[in-house]
Each structure stands twice: as C-alpha cells, then as structure tokens.
C-alpha cells in the first residue's frame, strides 16, 4: 500500500496517523515526493484517520503516482526525453582491442551508449562466461576514451563492488528479472537500472519487478523489452510490438527494446528495431561486433558495422516521422 501526502505540509500528520495505528511503514523519497509504504491492505488503511493523502494499492511505476513521463539520465544521455537513444556494442567483452574498435566505430556511426557483457549468464556452464572484472575495466577504459556511457549486466549482489563507479547503468537480465534480493538491493542505490522482462513474464509481473526497485527509492529505471518464449521457433523469442504501447500507457518509466535477442539472426534485427521505434520505444539496445561470425557468444544475432550503420540511419529517420 502506498500513501502519498497531497501536500508537503500534511506529511507530519500522515506520519503521526500511521504511528498511532501501530502500523509498520517506511518513508521513501521518490521523484521529489515523500511516500509512505506499508504491507497492509487498503481495507486496513481505511480505518486509519488519514486526511489529505492519496492511497493506492501499488504501482509506483504507474501514472497514478506520476502522470508525466520519466526520463533517466545516464552520464550525458537522457533516456525518455524525446530523442531516440541507441546503445550498441558486443554481447560479450572479449579483449581490449576488440572493445576499443567497436566502441570507436559505434560512436562514429551515431550510438549514444556502449553496451557490453563482462559477467555472462549462459545457458550451459561450458559456454564462455565472460571476463568478469577484467571486462569491467575494459568497458571503463573505452568509455573514458570515447565518451560513451556504459551499460553492462549485473548477475549477483556480490558483484556490485566491481560495477560501482565503473559502469554507468546496470542491466538486470531476463534470468534475474525476478531475483527479488538483487532488485531490492538496486532499489537502495541511485544507479540507473535497465530492467529486462523475464522469458515468461506477463507485463504485470515485469512491472512488479520494477516496483521492487522503485519502492526502495531508486526511480532511475528503464524497462527493456526483449521478447518472450513461445512455441514458434523461426525466431529466438517472440517480440510483441504491442508490449511497448501497453507499457507506455500503464507506466511513466522509459521503454527500451532489445531486438537482437528475439531475432536470433542478424537479418531480422533491423526490422524488429524499426517495429519497436514505430510502436514508441525510447531506446534500443543493439548487439554489434567487429567480426560477428567469430564472436564468443550470440554470434548469429550480432551486426557488423555495415549492418549497424544501416540500422541506425533507418531508425533515426523513422523516429523523426513517428515523433
């Protein structure tokens, strides 16, 4: 349950009423507002003499709490401010030379951010698992050289010490989208979070994952749609372009789309990216490699520089049309 004082002057009275009720609650500051959060139900709250406050069952992500769209700042980039943001880079960081070449080229071609995996959640333990801290250091080095803010996936709370101060935005991948311990932990930090949907999540379940972060006081959340698993195997996952407008209607949070993973094959990535932009995505996350066929992970879906050049030109043109 979320209780929002209608006026800053009413905050002490709301707090006193909750304390007098012996109800367990906590105060959170989010988007310039003071909120009181309790695990009690709306029925319980009805009997508390709270005046001049809005009571909602849940949904810090919803437009009931914040009507205007949120934008999230990552380095010198604003996601959700009206300009299409494109994050590009390899699925996995493989070497200093590889990452520097990719970082310089994607910036030259118009990318706003550098993506790259240092800790890799792979389906089998025998696949390349990433370079770990070495990869993080490489990301920071290329970021400092190119000026591109970075986004990289965090898999475990214990790894946060490696990311802090080195990576600008933390990605929570599909497999961790309901890792509630990790989500709560990130809610206690101010770091921007790119939250992907789980392979079998409904939109409501995914938004509730965002709620774990928001309810800790961290409002810097971007929702990233990466498709869901279905019976169809022509593509790696099913990308429902209807998910983006539904998210924009139900939530004030910025929406990113990852067309690389649902495509599974590079020839489909641009088309899915165009569909995401046409449906209202604020951001795209694209896998790009200097030698895709030799990539250590997700080789089939990574674009080469020519493919990325064509994609980014076309999505920028489309964004100008759809606004």
Regions found by a protein language model. Name each.
Residues 5, 57-87, 320-323:
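N-terminal amphipathic alpha-helix/helix-capping segment at the start of soluble metabolic enzymes
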Residues 128-152, 186-192, 241-256, 301-323:
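Alpha-helix-loop-beta-strand connector modules within alpha/beta enzyme cores
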Residues 131, 148-156, 168-181, 191-203, ...:
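Catalytic beta/alpha-barrel core
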Residues 73-91, 122-125, 248-257:
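N-terminal small/glycine-rich loop or linker at the start of catalytic domains
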Residues 74, 189-288:
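Catalytic alpha/beta core domains of metabolic enzymes, predominantly
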Residues 115-133, 290-300:
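Glycine-rich, proline-tolerant flexible connector loops at the mouths of alpha/beta enzymes
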Residues 84-101, 125-129, 149-153, 174, ...:
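Active-site mouth loops of central-metabolism enzymes
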Residues 84-90, 112-116, 150-152, 170-172, ...:
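Hydrophobic faces of well-ordered beta-strands that scaffold small-molecule active sites
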């Amino acid at each position: 349950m979320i209780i929002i004082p209608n006026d800053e002057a009413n905050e002490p009275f709301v707090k006193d009423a909750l304390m007098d009720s012996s109800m367990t609650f906590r105060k959170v500051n989010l988007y310039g507002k003071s909120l009181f959060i309790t695990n009690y139900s709306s029925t319980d709250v009805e009997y508390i003499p709270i005046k001049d406050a809005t009571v909602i069952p849940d949904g810090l992500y919803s437009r009931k709490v914040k009507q205007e769209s949120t934008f999230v700042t990552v380095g010198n980039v604003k996601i959700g401010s009206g300009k299409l943001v494109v994050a590009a880079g390899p699925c996995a960081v493989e070497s200093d030379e590889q990452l520097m070449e990719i970082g310089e080229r994607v910036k030259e071609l118009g990318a706003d951010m550098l993506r790259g995996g240092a800790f890799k959640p792979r389906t089998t333990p025998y696949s390349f698992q990433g370079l770990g801290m070495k990869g993080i250091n490489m990301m920071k080095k290329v970021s400092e050289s190119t000026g591109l803010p970075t986004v990289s996936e965090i898999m475990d709370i214990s790894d946060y010490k490696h990311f802090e101060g080195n990576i600008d935005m933390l990605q929570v991948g599909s497999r961790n989208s309901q890792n509630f311990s990790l989500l709560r932990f990130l809610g206690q930090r101010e770091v921007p979070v790119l939250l992907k949907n789980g392979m079998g999540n409904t939109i409501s379940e995914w938004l509730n994952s965002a709620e774990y972060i928001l309810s800790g006081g961290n409002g810097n959340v971007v929702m990233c749609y990466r498709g869901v698993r279905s019976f169809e195997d022509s593509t790696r996952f099913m990308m429902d372009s209807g998910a983006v407008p539904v998210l924009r209607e139900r939530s004030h949070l910025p929406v990113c789309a990852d067309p690389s993973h649902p495509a599974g094959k590079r020839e489909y990535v641009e088309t899915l990216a165009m569909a995401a932009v046409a449906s209202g995505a604020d951001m795209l996350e694209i896998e790009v490699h200097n030698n895709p066929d030799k990539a250590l992970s997700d080789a089939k879906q990574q674009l080469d520089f020519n493919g990325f050049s064509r994609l980014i030109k076309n999505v920028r043109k489309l964004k100008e049309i759809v606004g």
